[in-house]
C-alpha cells in the first residue's frame, strides 16, 4: 500500500501584501506622463488658458523594474501662436503643430499604446504619474471640457511625483517648489545632459527618480493616489470629514479653501460654475450663487474647495473664460461663504436632506397657489420628488406668501422637462423657472426670515439749519467749479481781501446725495455791493488748476439750492419738498430743567420729542441751531463758520454764537405745534387727502397769526395747513 503524500508546506507571506518586502503597495504599472501647452510652462502651466501641444509618456513596472517604450506625440492647437517661452524651450513651430492630430485623436492613440505597453510588461492595472498636478487639473480637464470631450477613467486618478518624493524626503523644499531637476539632484542621480528633445529628458529623469524611490523601503510610497471628481455633487454643503445634514451658520469654514468668482452670466447655474473649475475638487454643495437686494443673482459666486491646494490652483484661473465672458477669481473668507450658504431653518434642512437632487426655483406664483396647483402646473411628465414634500414655499415672517418656491427633481432629464414650462401660465400669471442651488435656497429663506428687503427706517433726526435772513438783495455769491478737495481755508485764500466782508456763518458748502462736496458753495457777504465786487474780482480765478466761476445771487436763490432745489442758467427750480417758504424755518428754544440725554437717544428721535412737556417761551428769544454734522443727516449742505471759528459736535440744542443774533430775524416760529410723520401713505394720496385726516384738529383762524413768521401774507384756514405738509 502506497503511503499518502506528505501535506504541502504552509503558504509563505505574499510579497504583494508585505510592505517590508515590497516598497510599492500599488499592484499595477505606472504611466509617467509629461505635457506642455503653447503658453506658460512649469508652475504656471495652464494659467494662461492655452491649448495642449505635447504629450510624452513611458510605462514603468515597479516590481520588475522594467520600462516600456518612450512615446512622444504632438497635439494640434486651435491657436497656432506659441509663446516665446514655449518656442525657446521646445523648439517647436506653428507649422509642425499644424500637421499634428487633434486632441481627441491623440487621446485615442495614447490609450491604445499604453494598453499595449502594459500588456508587454505583464498586464494588470495602471495609473498615471505626473510631475505636479497642473497637467491634469489645469490643462487636460479644462480643455476637454471646453471641447466637449469625454476623458477615459484613467485621467481621474494619478500619482503626484512631487508629493511622493516629499513624503520620502520631507527635509527638502515644499512639494509645490520641487522640479524634476531638483528631485534628481536631491537623490544624486546622473542625468543625460546631452538630451535636447523637449519632454524626453523630463520623462527619462522622472523614471529614474521613481526607480530610485522604489529601492527605499516604505509602506507609504504610491499608496494614496490623487483623485479628480468626475462630477459636482449638489446638495447642502458639509465638511468633507464630518458630514452634517445641512450647512449651519455655526459651521466654521477654512478661509484657505474659498474663492469668489465675479462676472458670471446671470443665467449660469452651480453646474456651470463647477464646469468652469473642471479638474478641481469642489466641495459638496460648495457653489454658492450670490443674490442682490432684490433676491436676484448678481453675477458673483463663492466656491469652496476640498483643500487649500485646490484653492491655489483655482486662483490661477483668474480671467479665464466662460463662453465669451472672462471670470475674475479672488480670495474670499470662510465667514463670507457661511453667510451666503449657511442656514438655521429646520424646514430647509429637511428639504435639502435628499441627496443627488436637482433644484429648480419657481418665481411669480399667485399668492393663493398651493402645492396641488404647483404640481398640476408642472404636470405628470416631470414629477416632483416626494410630491408635495419636494416643494418648499418661501413666506414672509408673518406667513404671507412671496410668490417664490423651490422644487426637487430626481434627475437631470426631469429638471429639463420642467424647465420647458418656463413662462407657462398658472391662472393669470406666467411662472418663471430657473436652476437653483442649496445655497440659493438658504439665501432666499434667510433673506425673508430676517425681515423685509427694504426695512423701515427709524425716524431721522430733523435738524434745524442756521436761519438765513430774509431779503431779495443780491448780497450773496455762488462759487461753481470748486475742486472736490477744496476746504474752507482754500476758499478764504481764493477770495483774498473779499474774505473780510463775509458775514458770520456765511460760507455754505453744497453736498451731493452721497454727502460729498459737489463743487458748489454759497457765501453771504455784508452787502450787495461787496458781493458784486467779489464776483468781479474773483470770477474765473484758478484754484488748484481749476478755474472757479463766481456770480452774485440772492439769499432766496441760495436758500432754494441749500434746501434741495437747483439753480441753473435757465432759472430756479423749487426743492423736492415743494415748501413755499423761501428760507429754512427757524425755531425758538425753551428754558427747562437741565436734562442729560444720551447721544444715541438724541440721534434716533426728533429733538421736539426730547423736550420737556412744559414749554414756556423765554425772553429774549434766542435762536436755536444744529451743528454741521447734524445738518448733513437731513439737508444737502454744510454750513461753515469762518468768523469766529466754531465747530460744535454735541447733538442737540446749543448756545447760539452772539454774532449770529444780529442776522437772525426779529420774529421766529414758535414751538407751540408738533411735527407728525405719516408712514404707509398710498402713492395716489394728494394734499386734500392728507388734510382731511387732520380735519378735526385744525386751529381757529385767529390762532394762525402767532404761528406765521413776520412778513408772510395773510392766509385762510384752508391755506395755512397746506404749507406744513411735505410729500
Swiss-Prot record:
Superkingdom field: Eukaryota
Residue numbers bearing the Phosphoserine modification: 83, 573
Region annotated Disordered, chain positions: 1-22
Induction (UniProt): Down-regulated during the epithelial-to-mesenchymal transition (EMT).
InterPro entries: ESRP, Nucleotide-bd_a/b_plait_sf, RBD_domain_sf, RNaseH-like_sf, RNaseH_sf, RRM_dom
Single GO MF annotation: mRNA binding
GO cellular component: nucleoplasm; nucleus; ribonucleoprotein complex
Subunit structure: Interacts with RBPMS.
Name assigned to this protein: Epithelial splicing regulatory protein 2
Encoding gene, per UniProt annotation: ESRP2
Amino acid at each position: 500500500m502506497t503511503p499518502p503524500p506528505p501535506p504541502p508546506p504552509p503558504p509563505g507571506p505574499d510579497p504583494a501584501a508585505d510592505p517590508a518586502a515590497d516598497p510599492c503597495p500599488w499592484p499595477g504599472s505606472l504611466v509617467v506622463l509629461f505635457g506642455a501647452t503653447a503658453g506658460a510652462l512649469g508652475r504656471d502651466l495652464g494659467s494662461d488658458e492655452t491649448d495642449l501641444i505635447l504629450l510624452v509618456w513611458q510605462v514603468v513596472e515597479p516590481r520588475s523594474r522594467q520600462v516600456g517604450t518612450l512615446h512622444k506625440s504632438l497635439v494640434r492647437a486651435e491657436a497656432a501662436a506659441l509663446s516665446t517661452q514655449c518656442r525657446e524651450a521646445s523648439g517647436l513651430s506653428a507649422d509642425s503643430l499644424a500637421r499634428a492630430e487633434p486632441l481627441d485623436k491623440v487621446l485615442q492613440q495614447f490609450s491604445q499604446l499604453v494598453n499595449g505597453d502594459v500588456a508587454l510588461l505583464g498586464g494588470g492595472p495602471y495609473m498615471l504619474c505626473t510631475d505636479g498636478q497642473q497637467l491634469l487639473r489645469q490643462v487636460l480637464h479644462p480643455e476637454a471640457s471646453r471641447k466637449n470631450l469625454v476623458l477615459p477613467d484613467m485621467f481621474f486618478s494619478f500619482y503626484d511625483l512631487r508629493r511622493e518624493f516629499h513624503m520620502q524626503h520631507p527635509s527638502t523644499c515644499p512639494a509645490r517648489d520641487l522640479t524634476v531637476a531638483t528631485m534628481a539632484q536631491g537623490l544624486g542621480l546622473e542625468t543625460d545632459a546631452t538630451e535636447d528633445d523637449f519632454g524626453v529628458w523630463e520623462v527619462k529623469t522622472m523614471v529614474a527618480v521613481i526607480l530610485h524611490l522604489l529601492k527605499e523601503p516604505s509602506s507609504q510610497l504610491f499608496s494614496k493616489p490623487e483623485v479628480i471628481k468626475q462630477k459636482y455633487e449638489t446638495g447642502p454643503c458639509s465638511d468633507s470629514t464630518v458630514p452634517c445634514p445641512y450647512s449651519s451658520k455655526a459651521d466654521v469654514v477654512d478661509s484657505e479653501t474659498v474663492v469668489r468668482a465675479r462676472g458670471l452670466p446671470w443665467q449660469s447655474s452651480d453646474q456651470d460654475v463647477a464646469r468652469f473649475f473642471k479638474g478641481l475638487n469642489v466641495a459638496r454643495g460648495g457653489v454658492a450663487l450670490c443674490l442682490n437686494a432684490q433676491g436676484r443673482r448678481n453675477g458673483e459666486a463663492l466656491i469652496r474647495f476640498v483643500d487649500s491646494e485646490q484653492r491655489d490652483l483655482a486662483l490661477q484661473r483668474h480671467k479665464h473664460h466662460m463662453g465669451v465672458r472672462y471670470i475674475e477669481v479672488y480670495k474670499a473668507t470662510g465667514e463670507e461663504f457661511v453667510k451666503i450658504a449657511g442656514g438655521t431653518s429646520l424646514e430647509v434642512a429637511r428639504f435639502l436632506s435628499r441627496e443627488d437632487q436637482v433644484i429648480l426655483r419657481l418665481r411669480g406664483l399667485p399668492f393663493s397657489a398651493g402645492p396641488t396647483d404647483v404640481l398640476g402646473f408642472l404636470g405628470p411628465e416631470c414629477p416632483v420628488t416626494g410630491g408635495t414634500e419636494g416643494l418648499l414655499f418661501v413666506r414672509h415672517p408673518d406667513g404671507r406668501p412671496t410668490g417664490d418656491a423651490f422644487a426637487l427633481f430626481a434627475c437631470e432629464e426631469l429638471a429639463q422637462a420642467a424647465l420647458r414650462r418656463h413662462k407657462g401660465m398658472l391662472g393669470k400669471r406666467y411662472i418663471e423657472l430657473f436652476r437653483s442651488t442649496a445655497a440659493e435656497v438658504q439665501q432666499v429663506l434667510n433673506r425673508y426670515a430676517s425681515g423685509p428687503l427694504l426695512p423701515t427706517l427709524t425716524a431721522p433726526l430733523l435738524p434745524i439749519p442756521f436761519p438765513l435772513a430774509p431779503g431779495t438783495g443780491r448780497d450773496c455769491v455762488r462759487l461753481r467749479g470748486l475742486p472736490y478737495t477744496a476746504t474752507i481755508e482754500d476758499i478764504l485764500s481764493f477770495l483774498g481781501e473779499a474774505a473780510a466782508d463775509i458775514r458770520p456763518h456765511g460760507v455754505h458748502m453744497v453736498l451731493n446725495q452721497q454727502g460729498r462736496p459737489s463743487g458748489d458753495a454759497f457765501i453771504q457777504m455784508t452787502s450787495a455791493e461787496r458781493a458784486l465786487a467779489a464776483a468781479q474780482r474773483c470770477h474765473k480765478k484758478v484754484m488748484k488748476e481749476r478755474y472757479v466761476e463766481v456770480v452774485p445771487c440772492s439769499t432766496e436763490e441760495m436758500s432754494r439750492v441749500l434746501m434741495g432745489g437747483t439753480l441753473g442758467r435757465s432759472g430756479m427750480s423749487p426743492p423736492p419738498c415743494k415748501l413755499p417758504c423761501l428760507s429754512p424755518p427757524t425755531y425758538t428754544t425753551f428754558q427747562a430743567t437741565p436734562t442729560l440725554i444720551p447721544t444715541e437717544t438724541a440721534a434716533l428721535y426728533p429733538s421736539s420729542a426730547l423736550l420737556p412737556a412744559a414749554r414756556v417761551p423765554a425772553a429774549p428769544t434766542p435762536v436755536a441751531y444744529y451743528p454741521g454734522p447734524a445738518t448733513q443727516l437731513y439737508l444737502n449742505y454744510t454750513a461753515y463758520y469762518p468768523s469766529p471759528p466754531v465747530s460744535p459736535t454735541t447733538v442737540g440744542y446749543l448756545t447760539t454764537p452772539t454774532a449770529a443774533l444780529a442776522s437772525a430775524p426779529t420774529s421766529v416760529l414758535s414751538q407751540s405745534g408738533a411735527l407728525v410723520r405719516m408712514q404707509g401713505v398710498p402713492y395716489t394720496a394728494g394734499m386734500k387727502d392728507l388734510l382731511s385726516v387732520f380735519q378735526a384738529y385744525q386751529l381757529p383762524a385767529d390762532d394762525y397769526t402767532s404761528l406765521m413768521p413776520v412778513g408772510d401774507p395773510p392766509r385762510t384756514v384752508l391755506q395755512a395747513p397746506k404749507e406744513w405738509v411735505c410729500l
